[in-house]
Every structure is written in structure tokens, then in C-alpha cells.
């Protein structure tokens, strides 16, 4: 039976925004953390404000949300936490250093915590997507168009060519993977970093 969906407009980078979200659902069994990534650039462009903003959005805010719901999950003996990070956590790119560094910081925090709460049937995993057909990729395509004079079709084709599957991922494919990790059937999977990259990652671990 499907429940009722409640939308909450909130800035997760603020205490008030996180409080508004938790007020709408104070005792969740499932938490999926996701936040806007910082814009690409070069190390010379990133000052203190840029670094602080990246870590607030992509490491600190998720960690604080996890802290807010974890005790309840442990008490109820069920919880599923999935952090949306990035494939570049394992395959960094210099232009994405802000995003990669902040999301990478969330990874060992989640891993360590997952070992503490696994006995309470609470799992914590990370999804590492790359090149899904979302607004983020539209933003990246526009940057390529502006910098290199490409058409939208050319920019998207170049993106697809970097993926072993030869195409961008579909949001529904991402949703299916996330839904499985949030399910009761995934209770023996925790502390993992699942690559969703069309087979592009070249490493073994």
C-alpha cells in the first residue's frame, strides 16, 4: 500500500531547513541524503568560502541529518541510510575537486558508523553515480557548449562516449538501485560504495 507524499521546501545547509524536513517526518525508517554539488572549476578559483560551502553541503549537512535520525532507527531495529555521493570519489577529476573532496570526506564517516549500527539492522551505504541524464548533466553540457563552442547534441555525445555503456544513465535505473538498498531485502549490505557508472570504473575495488 502506497503512503502519502509530503513535499518540504527547505535548505538542508541550514539548521532551520533540516528541522523543517524532520518536522514533516520525525521518525523515518529510510534516509536518502543528496544535495547540490558545487560548480566545477580549478584549484586557483577556490577560496575559503568555496571550500566551506562544499563541505557544508556535501559532508556536514548529510552527517547532521544522519545524527538526527539514527537513534530512532536503532531503537526500532530498522533503518536504511543511503548517501548520494559521486563516482569521482573513486576516480577524481581535477575540475571537480570541491565536490570530490567533500563527498569523499562523507565516505569514511559513513563506513565507520555503519559498523557500529549494523547489529541494530541499520545499514548505511553510498551510491556513486556518474553521467545520469539529469539537470546536473545538462549543466555540465552547457559549460562544454560555452567553453568549446559545441552544440547540445555534440556535448551530450561526448559525455556518452566516456561511459563504457555508451549512453547516459536513466534516472529510473538510479532509483531502482537506491530502492533496493533501502529495502528489507538489503539488510546484509552495509558500508558499501556502489558504483552506478555504466561499467566505466576501471579499478577492482
Model regions: which residues?
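Conserved NAD(P)H cofactor-binding loop of Rossmann-fold oxidoreductase domains
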Residues: 34-40, 199
